[in-house]
Structures are given as structure tokens and as C-alpha cells.
Amino acid sequence: MLTTKDLDEFRLLLGQINRMAQEDLVALWRGLEGLPADDAWRILEQTVPDVVEVYRASAAEASSVFYGDTQKVRFSSGDISKASQLNREQVVESMRYAMFADGVTSPLLILSGVVQKHVINGAREYGLSGFEDTGVGWFRAARAGACEFCRMLATRSVGKYGAAYSSAEAASVVGRGKRQRRTGAAQTGGEFHTNCMCLPVRADMFTPPDYYDRWLSEYNQASELVGTNDLKKLMWAMRNPQKALAVKG
């Protein structure tokens, strides 16, 4: 069975991979200090995706060992290659927001989140791709300090629906270019935000931690208060239970 220690150790490894990517990002950023914004952008647009690709491939390679050793699943060698592939247009779009959007006070901070998300997605994509190919159901493994969004997605399958997520519905959400096409992505559990460290894990090898019970209670309470499965309303109620209770009266 997959243990909390297994997950913690793998997240630690992914964190080390991400830190190397962040160091490269900061080095690039400092090397561009003093340049006009447009000139700096042209360089960043070309170099940052290259950095992400290198470390995303490392994350995908590490995940092949993680899933094989802890969950007894070894996917095709092509899955590592697929997981390493980066949707460069998606990365550049997020980078452009960081550099030029109104109200952004720390472009580097936002760029850091973009890099982290797409590097770690290399590991998640390997698992989701393999689960999809083999038809294995999966759960979303979230840390105890996860945000409300991740708590909700982590508990939806193990609680309300009582069955694992289907990767056939969710795997493409983490970003595979043309395959990123499905609406309602959050409803399938395959959406991961910046600085998220949730991981897809084989359902029949994972026992949800005790704190999932508390999260499920929070989710059920929010669902009762808003009376809908609308994602935004549920998130608001989970973050503001007292206000939601007052609105319901």
C-alpha cells in the first residue's frame, strides 16, 4: 500500500527538482535587470520554457520510479516522453500575464508559480497518462495543509461519489496541447494550480488520511448551505462558512 511517507518523500524530491528550476529562473531574471521590458520579454519568452522543459522531464522520470515502486504500476516508456512534453503556448501566455498585466507588482513571483506548476505537472502527467491507458481509477492525494480548492477535489470521489476518478475524463487537463479540451475540468479532479503539490495516486493502493473526513464534512456543509454543485459558490462557502450560513438564514 502507498504510505504517507512515500508521498512525503516523493514530494520532497519534486521540491528539489523545482528548486533547481527556480534557481535557473532567478539567474535568468537577474541577468536581464536593467533591460527595457520588451527586450527582457523577448529573451524570457524563449528561455523560460526551455528551463521548464528540462526540469519537467526530470519530474516525469522521477515519477516513473515512484509509481512503479509504490503502486506496482509501470507504464509504457512512451509515457515518460509524453509527460515531458510542454505546452509552450500555455506557459508563454501565463508569462505574458506576469510581465504585462495591470496591477502585477511582482512579475518574478508569478513567473515562479508558472514554472513550479508546469515542472510538477510532468510528474502528474505521467501518472494520469498511465492510469488513462490502463483504465486504473485514481484518487487525488493532498497534503494536510492543502487549500480549500484541493480539499474539495480530494474528497469528491472518496466521499460523495464513492468511486475513484476516471483518468479517461481527467488526464488531459494538466496540459497536453490539443488534448486539453474538456470543460468542467475541476469536476473531474484533474486541475492543478500554481504551488499545488497534489498528486494522482492509484485508488486501490491509497487509504485517505484521517483529515479527509474533516474536509468531507466541510464540503458537505458548504454544499448544503449553497444548495448547488457550482464550483465558485462551493469554494466561497468553504472559505466563508459563517457568511454562507448567514446568507442561507
Please describe what each predicted stretch is.
Residues M1-G130:
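N-terminal alpha-helical interaction blocks
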